[in-house]
Each structure stands twice: as C-alpha cells, then as structure tokens.
Amino acid sequence: MTQFDDHPLWQSSLNPADAPAVQSLSPVALAYLGDAVFELYVRCCYLFPPRRIGDFHRRVVAQVRAEQQAQILTTLLPQLTDPEKEWVRRGRNAATSTSRRANPELYQAASGLETLLGYLYLRDARRLDELLALIELPDAAPR
C-alpha cells in the first residue's frame, strides 16, 4: 500500500452500478483522466522533503514524460491482469497524435498506461494503489 491509502484522491465516487458508464468512455477520455491521476501521484511522491519549486518541477516532469511512462508500463506489464492489458491495448490503439519530440511507439505506450490508470481510478482504487506502489521513482520520499 502507499502513503496515500484512504486519501480522498484515490476514493472514486463511482459505485458498481456505474460500470456501464465507465465502459462506454473512450480510451482517450480515460487517458486524459489517467494523465492527471499519474501527475498528481508523482507530485505527491516528490512533495517531501521540501524542495525549491524548480527542483520539484524538474523531478515531476522527468517522470510524467512519455518516455518514462513507456518504461513504467514495461515494468508493470508482467503484473497486469488480462483485462488490464486489454485497457492498455485500447489506449495504445487510440493514441492519435504525438508530440514532435516523442517517438510514436513511446507515445502509444504512455497513452496505454494513462488509459489503464484512468480506468482504475474510476473502477478499482485499491488496484490503482497496488500498481502505483510498484513504480520506482528516483529520489522520491519513501512510500
């Protein structure tokens, strides 16, 4: 478990009856949410010990870039269930545009990770915590 257990951030307001609504969301919409969830998680991990805002920002940006997210996905893949891998696949296939500096394959992998994180945020906060706890962030506060 992470230091953020029982924090409202990870407590989705959706109940099991909302499952069809979540299933109907596009992978792009889930990736949009997953991007925000992941960045907020990384920001929380680097919040302590206190740092200058520029150092804080550099550390966070280094972790939320497509290249790093693709590497994180590679690390997590062996731990994913088949349904989770399906969300990653859907996210990869839905990635439509890339930044000029990003390799398209890396961008697709990052989109797959973000899609999965967005889905888990809405449907399974405990599993989201489990997967986030597996991510090693350099120089982050102990979790």
From Swiss-Prot:
Question: Which GO biological process annotations does it have?
Answer: rRNA processing
Subcellular location(s) of the protein: Cytoplasm
Q: Which GO terms describe its molecular function?
A: ribonuclease III activity; rRNA binding
The function of this protein is:
Involved in correct processing of both the 5' and 3' ends of 23S rRNA precursor. Processes 30S rRNA precursor transcript even in absence of ribonuclease 3 (Rnc); Rnc processes 30S rRNA into smaller rRNA precursors.
UniProt family annotation: Belongs to the MrnC RNase family.
- Complex formation: Homodimer.
Q: What is this protein called?
A: Mini-ribonuclease 3
Taxonomy, top ranks, is: Bacteria, Bacillati, Cyanobacteriota, Cyanophyceae, Synechococcales
